[in-house]
From Swiss-Prot:
Signal peptide positions on this chain: none
The protein's name in its UniProt record: Protein X
Main location: host cell
Keyword set, alphabetical order: Activation of host NF-kappa-B by virus, Activator, Apoptosis, Host cytoplasm, Host G2/M cell cycle arrest by virus, Host mitochondrion, Host nucleus, Host-virus interaction, Modulation of host cell cycle by virus, Transcription, Transcription regulation
Record's comment on post-translational modification: A fraction may be phosphorylated in insect cells and HepG2 cells, a human hepatoblastoma cell line. Phosphorylated in vitro by host protein kinase C or mitogen-activated protein kinase. N-acetylated in insect cells.
One of the GO biological process terms: viral genome replication
Amino acid sequence: MAARLCCYLDPERDVLCLRPLQAEPSGRPFSGLSRPAETAAAAAVPAFHGAHLSLRGLPSCAFSSAGPCALRFTSATWRCMETPMNSVTCLRKRTLGLRTAPPTVMEQYIKDCLFEQWEEQGEEPRLKVFVLGGCRHKLVGTASPCIFFTSA
């Protein structure tokens, strides 16, 4: 399962939010997915050029206002969409103040630069496309949302 999402900070809740991109190139609607009404924060996000990307196979929590339960992602800016990393682990360690030696340059960038930019300056406009995968929603089977990131 993989899909691309638009990422932005919700300044009211101080939470990193993910919004699925819209339609496939053929303009075909997505079948079997119910989408809640967009919040004011989601509506404030500008239209994104990646609206042609597919969303087939996303779990239902991907459309939750709290965002997906768990996330594996990498930035499209680096042209590394095929090698996502588990951001939940990095975010948890960062929240606890733990430091580990990252195995890749990409992981180092995300941990030390991208999250810091989001925490201190807000959204980094060049880094908007992410790969979703490995969601706990399917494994745990719980309906309760899990906000995966709040800035310190």
